[in-house]
Each structure stands twice: as C-alpha cells, then as structure tokens.
C-alpha cells in the first residue's frame, strides 16, 4: 500500500513538469559526403553542396523540467551543376545555340529521435541551455545527368533537349547527431533559439548553425 502511495505521489510530481512542444528550425553550414560525379571524357567534376539550408520540424514530450524526448523530421538537398556552350547548329532552317549541361543532386529526408536536456541559467527562467544527442535515419536519393540543350537564337522560349547520360541511386543510413544551443522565452509559451549541431552517417556528415522557434503547451 505504501509503495502504491509513493508511486502515485511520484506520478503527480512527474506530471506537474510534463508538457509537449512543437517547433521549426532552419540550419545552414558545411556538409561532407561521398557523392562525387566525374565525367572523365568531358573533363567535368561535380561535388554537390548544400543548397537552401536544412529545414526541420520537431516535437517533444518534456518528462521533467530538465529532460525531454524529441522527435524530428528534416529535409535538405545538395546540388551542383555546370554548363558549357558548344556552338551553334542549324535545324529545319533555324539556328540554335548548343549548350551542354551537367547536373548532380541529392535529396535527403531525415528522421531523428533524441533525448534532450535543458538547464535554466537565470532566475526568471527566461533563458535556458539545451543539449541533445540521438539517432538519425536518413533516406538519400542521388541523381546525376548530362544533356544537350538547343535554344533557338531568335526566341529562347523555343528549345529542345537530348539526354546524354543519367544515373540515380538510393541510400538509407542510420546515423548519430549531437546538438546544443540556447533558447529565450520571448512571449508566454513561445521560445526562440540559436543552435549548432553535428550529424554523421555513412553517406554524409554536417555541421550546421540554426535558428528555431518552438511553442510549449
């Protein structure tokens, strides 16, 4: 009986600190990966880099004032391209500018789960430091292609393309992430934050600085 009472009191204490939160984050930084595309005969090498940053949606359940479990989804992509003017050609009485294009890109969908720890460092509980570390699952879709583009000299809306080469592959990778940052309670249950994170798996690793907003219920 005493154990049940103690458990019940512990549960009440635990629930007093329990709440959920949702948020959005934008990050940008440096990325390394193993997807390099070399067109040896053309003398062209492509090394896709992160474009438009990394957008993340996240949510979590705060078990205590210091500990929560967070889930998130992120989308990001790497891109690189190169073009070269070959010359002009005539076809059906029209003159066209002949350009050769090379393109390589990677689209990534990432999911993560991470325990997170928070610590207030002011008396009013407006500022807090965060650290999280967890596991990622990322689906990479890589695609490279080369094609010839012919654009009518007198009207660039008239054009056609001929594919020279295309290749694609998919990778599913388990990885690791760690991140830290600070949040500020700007209004009521709304928090704004700055963060830095590092993520690594067999396909890529990244170091990103981010800004975020989250709402706690």
Where are these regions (language model features)?
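Residues on the lipid-exposed face of transmembrane beta-strands in outer-membrane beta-barrel proteins
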Residues: 24, 57-61, 73, 113-119, ...
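Repeated loop/turn-to-beta-strand initiation elements of outer-membrane beta-barrel proteins
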Residues: 20-22, 66-71, 124-127, 184-192
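Extracellular/periplasm-exposed beta-strand and loop segments of Gram-negative cell-envelope proteins
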Residues: 31-52, 75-110, 138-173, 198-200
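Detector for outer-membrane/organellar transmembrane beta-barrel domains
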Residues: 23, 27, 111-120, 126-140, ...
């Amino acid at each position: 009986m005493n154990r049940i009472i103690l458990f019940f009191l512990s549960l009440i204490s635990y629930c007093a600190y329990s709440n959920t939160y949702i948020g959005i984050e934008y990050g940008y930084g440096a990325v390394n990966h193993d997807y390099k595309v070399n067109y040896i005969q053309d003398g062209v090498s492509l090394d896709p880099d992160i474009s438009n940053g990394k957008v993340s949606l996240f949510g979590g359940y705060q078990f205590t004032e210091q500990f929560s479990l967070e889930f998130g989804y992120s989308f990001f992509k790497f891109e690189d391209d190169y073009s070269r003017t070959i010359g002009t050609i005539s076809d059906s009485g029209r003159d066209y500018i002949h350009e050769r294009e090379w393109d390589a890109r990677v689209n990534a969908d990432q999911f993560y789960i991470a325990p997170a720890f928070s610590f207030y460092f002011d008396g009013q509980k407006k500022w807090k430091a965060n650290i999280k570390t967890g596991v990622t699952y990322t689906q990479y879709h890589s695609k490279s292609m080369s094609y010839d583009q012919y654009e009518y000299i007198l009207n660039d809306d008239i054009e056609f393309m001929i594919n020279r080469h295309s290749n694609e592959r998919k990778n599913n990778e388990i990885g690791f992430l760690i991140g830290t940052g600070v949040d500020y309670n700007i209004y009521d249950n709304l928090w704004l934050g700055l963060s830095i994170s590092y993520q690594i798996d067999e396909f890529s690793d990244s170091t990103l600085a981010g800004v975020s907003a989250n709402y706690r219920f």
